[in-house]
């Protein structure tokens, strides 16, 4: 894009095509977070996770299941807050795109912009599309 326009951009905003229920405010919030924190290379849109690895997530180990993270929490509300990256909005600084040799986004210094979880449905199947239509009628 820079070659085509002859302009240098500070950042890129990537809006995932399979998350059409995000709002203009969601995009503005993510961009504002990037403007507030110039030390962050990427802003990911996230929503509050419905599961928590310190409380109610497990992994299979051999012939049984174990906690993902060992803890003594007896309620999800006691555990540290965790978020799901919802892949709806990414605000990525130019320097990260141009200078970063590591393709793994999580290896950067990143921040988050929290969105309402009902606005996020990854449309990967016809069922997802029908669910999105039903939710869209109520937003």
Which sequence ranges carry the predicted segments?
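Catalytic donor-sugar/metal-binding loop of nucleotide-sugar-dependent glycosyltransferases
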Residues: 101-121, 126-130, 134-139
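Conserved core of the sugar-phosphate nucleotidyltransferase
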Residues: 8-11, 20-109, 113-114
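Glycine/small-residue-rich loop that forms an oxyanion/phosphate-binding "nest" at active or ligand-binding sites
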Residues: 1-6
